[in-house]
């Protein structure tokens, strides 16, 4: 009990582990495989805080590298506790020993090793605070012989730090640029969500009548129903957002490192405004100006900086071209909404014919875009959604919209396959009263499917998981057919495997659907069973076998 209270005082909201004899003294929620345990708490909190990860030292810890690096680029505050070989045997090459600090040096913002059990509370304080201050994982390495020791220690006082609000001169200069702008545009990133700054962003955007584009895979950083919401930029994002931001003379990049995928050309549009003045706000000064030239850089919390800028805007800020800008925003959004609702298939590249051939051969099956339209008819407004890496999930980038933050979970720029399933498990653990829906292609799902036997247990909360089934590694097939004269190798998956049947064998519901109507109904029913009966459902969506998304470089 005292241990649990200690974690809570420090803001650790959930802790997950993979069972092992190095950590039998600590347990909260156990999974079946290392990557699953590490992905789960990365997204399990809805309120601001820090989640926890731990597993067996050595081979258990090596499974954490990909998920922890994913959390690093997703800017997730996370406590990583790594059991180490016993103090007396370190360096002797004993059972499951390796240099675990070196292993994570590039994947955490801070790391510290404990060599005396009396220092555990002090180090725990420091590591958690570093994770919170830097919005990133931080590592605490503890020799395994300390885990079962009982000692008397004084718990140090928790010392919290305020996040910075930006330099005075920089905030004033940003306010001046936005006050003078004729076509201001705001780009919202993960920092807006992590700092709870959406209300501040709304006030600033409305004061300027500035359209708001969202960073790639951060669709929940601005309310989708807002008249100024333009949708996500980047791969398969919002054409409306791309058309609008290319007209900007001033861009406020709020809470974002301007990752490359958020400025990637799409639909034949190289939209990043080359002559615009760029104001970049990021909690990490090292990332300001890293990918794009900036006019003003501000190190600070997105919410505090937004409030500071708003307070210093001139009385006429946003007035230049306000009426025309509002009209153009509305027209552009309407035109894109109509186009998106009628998009059914992907175009073939010159010299390839996979998509057109698939439409003829599999005329009775859905395309990915048709599936996404059917899905959005059944997703509850308050749902938390996770998406995996890969062709079918990426094609759906423009479809999900949200009215609140911490609702959209995505693999981010590290791009690990197998993220969608364990991340939605973690979301449900942290938010048991909220409907959750995970999405993954059949290739990506196969990487993490061993957690099906974990979530089938009675002590696990219920989820809904949608698996896009086109029996191929679609993104890789897309690239090989393009680069190698319409040829491919190693991209096909077993057509005799049924994930719906495996789900039923694991004690959960398994459903297979072929049409839009079946998909909408199955998803509606699955979410209802999740919330009313605490039942987990896996929906296997049969798709056209070879619809491949547009290329990215």
Where are these regions (language model features)?
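Structural motif
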Residues: 250, 384, 435-437
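C-terminal segment of classical bacterial N-terminal signal peptides
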Residues: 17-25
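N-terminal alpha/beta PP-like core and its mobile active-site loop of ThDP/TPP-dependent enzymes
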Residues: 51-320, 353, 378-381, 460-465, ...
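Bacterial Sec-dependent N-terminal signal peptides
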Residues: 1-12
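Active-site diphosphate/adenylate-binding microenvironment
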Residues: 335-431
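N-terminal propeptides/low-complexity segments immediately following signal peptides
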Residues: 28-47
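Long, charged amphipathic helices and adjacent flexible linkers at domain junctions
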Residues: 155-171, 322-362
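Thiamine diphosphate
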Residues: 81, 89-96, 291, 297-299, ...
């Amino acid at each position: 009990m005292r241990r649990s209270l200690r974690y809570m005082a420090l803001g650790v909201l959930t802790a997950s582990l993979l069972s092992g004899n190095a950590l039998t003294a600590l347990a909260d929620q156990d999974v079946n495989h290392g990557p699953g345990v590490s992905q789960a708490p990365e997204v399990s909190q809805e309120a601001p805080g820090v989640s926890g990860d731990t597993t067996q030292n050595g081979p258990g810890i090596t499974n954490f590298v990909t998920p922890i690096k994913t959390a690093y680029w997703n800017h997730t505050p996370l406590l990583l506790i790594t059991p180490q070989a016993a103090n007396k045997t370190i360096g002797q090459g004993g059972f499951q020993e390796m240099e675990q600090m070196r292993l994570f040096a590039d994947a955490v913002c801070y790391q510290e090793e404990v060599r005396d059990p009396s220092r555990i509370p002090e180090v725990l304080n420091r590591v958690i605070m570093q994770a919170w201050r830097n919005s990133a994982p931080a590592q605490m390495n503890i020799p395994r012989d300390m885990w079962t020791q009982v000692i008397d220690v004084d718990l140090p006082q928790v010392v919290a730090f305020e996040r910075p609000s930006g330099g005075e001169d920089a905030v004033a200069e940003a306010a001046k640029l936005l006050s003078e702008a004729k076509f201001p545009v705001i780009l919202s990133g993960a920092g807006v969500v992590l700092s709870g700054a959406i209300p501040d962003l709304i006030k600033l955007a409305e004061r300027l009548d500035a359209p708001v584009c969202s960073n790639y895979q951060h669709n929940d950083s601005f309310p989708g129903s807002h008249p100024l919401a333009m949708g996500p930029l980047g791969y398969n994002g919002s054409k409306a957002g791309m058309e609008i931001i290319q007209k900007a003379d001033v861009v406020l990049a709020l809470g974002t490192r301007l990752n490359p995928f958020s400025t990637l050309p799409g639909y034949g549009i190289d939209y990043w405004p080359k002559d615009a003045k760029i104001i970049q706000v990021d909690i990490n000064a090292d990332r300001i100006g890293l990918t794009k030239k900036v006019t003003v850089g501000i190190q600070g919390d997105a919410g505090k900086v937004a409030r500071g800028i708003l307070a210093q805007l001139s009385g006429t800020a946003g007035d230049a071209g306000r009426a025309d800008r509002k009209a153009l925003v509305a027209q552009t959004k309407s035109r894109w909404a109509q186009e998106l609702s009628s998009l059914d298939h992907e175009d073939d590249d010159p010299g390839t014919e996979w998509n057109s051939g698939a439409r003829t051969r599999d005329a009775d099956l859905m395309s990915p875009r048709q599936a996404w339209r059917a899905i959005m008819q059944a997703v509850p407004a308050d749902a938390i959604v996770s998406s995996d890496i890969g062709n079918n999930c990426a094609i759906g980038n423009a479809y999900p919209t949200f009215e609140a933050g911490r609702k959209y979970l995505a693999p981010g720029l590290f791009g690990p396959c197998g993220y969608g399933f364990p991340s939605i498990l973690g979301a449900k653990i942290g938010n048991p009263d909220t409907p959750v829906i995970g999405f993954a292609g059949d290739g990506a799902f196969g990487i993490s499917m061993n957690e099906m036997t974990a979530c089938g247990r009675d002590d696990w909360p219920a989820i809904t998981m949608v698996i896009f089934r086109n029996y191929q590694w679609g993104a890789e097939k897309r690239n090989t057919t393009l680069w190698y004269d319409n040829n491919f190798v190693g991209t096909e998956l077993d057509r005799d495997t049924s994930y719906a049947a495996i789900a039923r064998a694991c004690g959960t519901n398994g459903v297979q659907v072929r049409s839009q109507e079946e998909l909408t109904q199955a998803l509606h029913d699955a979410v209802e069973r999740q919330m009313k009966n605490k039942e987990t459902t896996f929906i296997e969506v049969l798709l056209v076998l070879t619809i491949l998304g547009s290329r990215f470089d």
